[in-house]
């Protein structure tokens, strides 16, 4: 069994299904462990960044959606929605086997970023066009 270490605590790698970094005055990670969200605080942004790099290296099958890194297995579907109804940008909507803070959509200010993300997701999920 493979284990990972999050700020000194060891967890079986199979119990972690998502994680995200929050860079504020008090940096922290939000980690989904055994279907519950845990907040792991850090003294400074550099320590948190090191932990994020460690997690990203140990979960190569996770994909970045918005600020979250989640297991590809939990993504049930995703749909490019195009221009947002309010005209605020371009939207990609996701259906996952669990909810994440921040909703189920990611927005892009520029159309080229939106199209680039669609291409990236098509490649990540081996979409047959």
Where in this protein do the model-derived segments appear?
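Acidic, Ser/Thr- and proline-rich intrinsically disordered linker/docking segments
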Residues: 9, 15-69, 74-129
């Amino acid at each position: 069994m493979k284990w990972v270490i999050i700020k000194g605590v060891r967890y079986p790698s199979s119990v972690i299904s998502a994680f995200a970094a929050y860079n504020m005055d008090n940096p922290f990670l939000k980690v989904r462990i055994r279907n519950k969200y845990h907040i792991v605080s850090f003294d400074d942004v550099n320590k948190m960044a090191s932990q994020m790099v460690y997690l990203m290296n140990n979960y190569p099958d996770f994909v970045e959606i918005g600020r979250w890194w989640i297991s590809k297995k939990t993504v049930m579907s995703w749909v490019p929605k195009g221009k947002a109804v309010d005209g605020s940008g371009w939207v990609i909507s996701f259906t996952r086997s669990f909810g994440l803070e921040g909703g189920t959509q990611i927005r892009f200010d520029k159309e080229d970023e939106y199209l680039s993300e669609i291409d990236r997701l098509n490649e990540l999920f081996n979409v047959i066009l």
